[in-house]
Amino acid sequence: MSQLFNFSAGPAMLPVDVLKQAQEELLNWNGQGVSVMEISHRDPVYVHMAREAEQDLRDLLNVPDDYEVLFLQGGGRGQFSAVPQNIASPDATVDYLDTGIWSGFAIREAEKFVSKVNVAGQVQEGAKGKEIQSPENWKLSENAAYFHYCPNETVDGIALHEIPDVKAPIVADMSSNILSEPLDVSKFGVIYAGAQKNIGPSGFAIAIVKKSLLGHPQKQVSSIMDYQLQAKDGSMYNTPNTFAWYLAGLVFKWLKAQGGLTAMGERNRHKAQLLYDFVDKSDFYRNDINPAYRSIMNIPFQLAYDKLDAEFLQGAKNQGLLGLKGHRFVGGMRASIYNAMPVEGVEALLNYMADFERKLG
């Protein structure tokens, strides 16, 4: 079978080398004679692997020593409620930048746990397409407990490439762009990310939390969502998702072998530029995001005629190009090109798009 390329927004494509290693080790991990899924999370061999994975992640992101790195359950949505319960009091005001579907979900969840959620800014229509309001137009609270934003919205493919300059501790939902390029972690109070896009399989999340923000959780926060408790127990207060942690560790080593985040950033920008250049030059395809705010991870595009969508998707599937259907809220197409997507996959998609346009455009 020829190689397939999975453009799904998540769960997403994983590096082939990682999958092959996991396959080889599935029945006999690390010489233990059993699968990694069958070993206790308290076993010294497993604990060593878990700590090594954490250190590799710290190395990749240059995480300062005054931050905890937590491996948690519940995915990104679990963090929507964990964040306000851990770093804001019930009577607090918090600022949220509303840049899309996932920001909206986070806002509605936060409203359950704090007195006021202030929407500081949002997406607007500009002369060059959809864009995020300029920071000078944001309406920030004077004493916000934190400022939350999602730097990369997967549904619309809109991104904020500059870290906001605000007084409050910054919380970022990086579920879809973590590890895609270098990042200055020291500018953030909390970074969290669901795993199923650039880290590993679905069902768990990473949270990177500044230690100075810990220690004052709301009374009702569940123990497994308590950042300080999980940090104290090395993310093993409850039995973690042992296989996902292991697989994430393999991904971190793969990223190091690729040259780290500087190399990945260059590769990802190149892949995205290939797609955007093709779409912008075409009269058959279009992208409605202002180029200054375009995502390098998720590239939505529309066909000239909606009636051709089903035919486009079936033809793509026949060519081994999977997961291109756009989100149900917006329709059209979407190519998610996370770290594991090789440039060859993007080139295969472009060849198919050009051929489809020649035949039906």
From Swiss-Prot:
Sorted UniProt keywords: Amino-acid biosynthesis, Aminotransferase, Cytoplasm, Pyridoxal phosphate, Pyridoxine biosynthesis, Serine biosynthesis, Transferase
Enzyme class name: transferase
InterPro entries for the chain: Aminotrans_V_dom, Aminotrans_V_PyrdxlP_BS, Pser_aminoTfrase, PyrdxlP-dep_Trfase, PyrdxlP-dep_Trfase_major, PyrdxlP-dep_Trfase_small
Binding site for L-glutamate: 42
Cofactor remark: Binds 1 pyridoxal phosphate per subunit.
Protein's pathway: Amino-acid biosynthesis; L-serine biosynthesis; L-serine from 3-phospho-D-glycerate: step 2/3; Cofactor biosynthesis; pyridoxine 5'-phosphate biosynthesis; pyridoxine 5'-phosphate from D-erythrose 4-phosphate: step 3/5
Modified-residue entries (N6-(pyridoxal phosphate)lysine), positions: 197
Keyword Cytoplasm: yes
Co-factor(s): pyridoxal 5'-phosphate
Main location group: cytoplasm
Protein localization: Cytoplasm
Record Pfam families: Aminotran_5
Primary role: Catalyzes the reversible conversion of 3-phosphohydroxypyruvate to phosphoserine and of 3-hydroxy-2-oxo-4-phosphonooxybutanoate to phosphohydroxythreonine.
Subunit organization: Homodimer.
Protein name in the entry: Phosphoserine aminotransferase
